[in-house]
């Protein structure tokens, strides 16, 4: 059917269309039905999405389109477009199969991920898939299929470098912002680091959230190549790239659900590393009573990453670290940035636990690449850090990402809370600390 495009003048974060409710009902359509939009241009441009029904915003014969669709189809206001109503996705059958505890085939997982990437599944349907993974889990074959399917939906960054390294944490520990310290240490040592990070899913701040307090984190592939050629490293948000679009859409729903299934966590990490061509990878797996995983699960995760490293021909080193309590002094993007700058700047004194962990992780990469002898990596990392070279490299990266250290600011409100009892702190609940920071506005409000 033919409709006129009406600009909704809104950015939804995903392709969004609206149809007049009465007109849709006459056609037998309901909210969450699937449609394909195609232009009459040569060559035609096409996008699939889910419809939303409204009473007044859109008239009969019109289709309301968000900014994402306008950009994708290069539309003009009032332009006529062909709208085809699509049958229910086969993916729903496969998602129900996983909910019933059955293993999915390569083709079935590919179908689901392709539909997520093509906007053929609604957010509630993606949530159902995430819940199925969370409740039923995935075996190693399924996880590999998931990794490969996620990579297929996006582009692969090709960058020539002798030592292309990466570091990732499974997360869950407040203040565990070691990446912005590890990256400049490694870059100052002559290693290349293309660090694509997520924004926070269940925590108060992800690496991208922290860096975004003082610099841009959204760049195109070509812009990233220029930054890395100039500085040897970058710290950017993976969601702005086209490398793993399906993963980004899954993460968006994970944030709403506040859950991060193990199979998806592994697939998310591995797909990003493979898509940017990382050869040497260190994975930090914090464990503890209120961490994402306990020691038993941490050991299982390590075995899985070790297996995947061999399967995909990558050198992966998993390090199990103490996740019994938060790291550093501040929780949230701005406060964590302040902590890491104090660690990087030789003229300031930063949190010792944050420094020690960062040096250990950076030292591991230095040893893996042969930049340091076995057992001497942490010592070399310490030397680079305290010489000021890492801080200079950090500032160089921030400048290349159109940043400025002066952009850092803090929230207007603060309160000192004193205990009514005397005693010693014997335990800190990571999840409660993260929840408090999120209630204060993190990570959306970077300066809370």
Language-model regions, residue ranges each:
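Glycine/serine-rich anion-binding loops at beta->alpha junctions
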Residues: 164-187, 191-203
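Well-ordered secondary-structure scaffolds
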Residues: 101-106, 111, 116, 156-158, ...
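Alpha-helix C-terminal capping segments
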Residues: 180-192, 272-277, 312, 368
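A glycine-rich helix N-cap at a beta->alpha junction
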Residues: 210-234, 303-309, 313
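Acidic, glycine/proline-rich low-complexity segments that act as flexible tails and inter-domain linkers
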Residues: 86-174, 213-214, 393-400
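Active-site-proximal beta-alpha loop/turn segments in soluble metabolic enzymes
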Residues: 130-134, 167-168, 207-210, 245-255, ...
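Phosphate/diphosphate-binding glycine-rich loops and adjacent basic-rich segments that engage nucleotide
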Residues: 229-280
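Long, compositionally biased stretches
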Residues: 1-100
């Amino acid at each position: 059917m033919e409709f006129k495009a009406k600009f909704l003048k809104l950015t939804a974060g995903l392709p969004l269309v609206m149809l007049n409710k009465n007109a849709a009902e006459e056609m037998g359509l309901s909210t969450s039905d699937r449609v394909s939009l195609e232009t009459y241009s040569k060559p035609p441009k096409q996008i699939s999405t889910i419809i939303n029904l409204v009473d007044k915003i859109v008239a009969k014969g019109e289709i309301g389109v968000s900014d994402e669709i306008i950009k994708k189809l290069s539309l003009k206001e009032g332009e006529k477009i062909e709208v085809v109503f699509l049958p229910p996705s086969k993916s729903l059958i496969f998602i129900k199969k996983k909910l019933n505890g059955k293993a999915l085939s390569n083709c079935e997982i590919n179908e689901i991920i392709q539909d997520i990437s093509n906007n053929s599944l609604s957010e509630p349907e993606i949530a159902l898939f995430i819940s199925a993974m969370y409740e039923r889990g995935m075996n190693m074959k399924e996880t590999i299929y998931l990794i490969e399917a996620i990579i297929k939906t996006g582009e692969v960054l090709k960058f020539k470098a002798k030592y292309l390294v990466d570091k990732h944490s499974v997360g869950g520990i407040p203040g565990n912002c070691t990446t912005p310290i590890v990256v400049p240490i490694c870059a100052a040592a002559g290693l290349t680091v293309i660090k694509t990070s997520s924004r926070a899913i269940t925590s108060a701040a992800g690496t991208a959230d922290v860096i975004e307090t003082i610099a841009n984190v959204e760049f195109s592939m070509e812009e990233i190549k220029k930054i890395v050629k100039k500085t040897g490293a970058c710290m950017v948000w993976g969601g702005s790239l086209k490398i793993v679009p399906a993963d980004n859409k899954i993460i968006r729903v994970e944030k709403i659900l506040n859950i991060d299934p193990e199979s998806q966590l592994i697939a998310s990490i591995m797909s990003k590393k493979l898509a940017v061509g990382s050869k040497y990878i260190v994975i930090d797996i914090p464990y503890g009573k209120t961490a994402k995983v306990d020691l038993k699960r941490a050991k299982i995760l390590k075995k899985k990453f070790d297996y995947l490293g061999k399967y995909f021909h990558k050198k992966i080193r998993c390090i199990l670290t103490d996740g019994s309590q938060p790291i550093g002094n501040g929780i949230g993007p701005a406060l964590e940035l302040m902590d890491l700058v104090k660690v990087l700047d030789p003229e300031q004194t930063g949190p010792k636990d944050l420094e020690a962990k960062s040096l250990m992780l950076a030292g591991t990469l230095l040893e893996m690449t042969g930049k340091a002898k076995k057992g001497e990596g942490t010592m070399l990392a310490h030397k680079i850090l305290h010489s000021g070279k890492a801080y200079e490299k950090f500032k160089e990266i921030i400048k290349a990402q159109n940043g400025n250290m002066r952009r850092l600011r803090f929230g207007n409100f603060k309160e000192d809370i004193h205990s009514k009892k005397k005693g010693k702190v014997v335990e800190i609940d990571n999840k409660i600390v993260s929840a408090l920071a999120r209630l204060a506005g993190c990570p959306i409000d970077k300066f809370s």
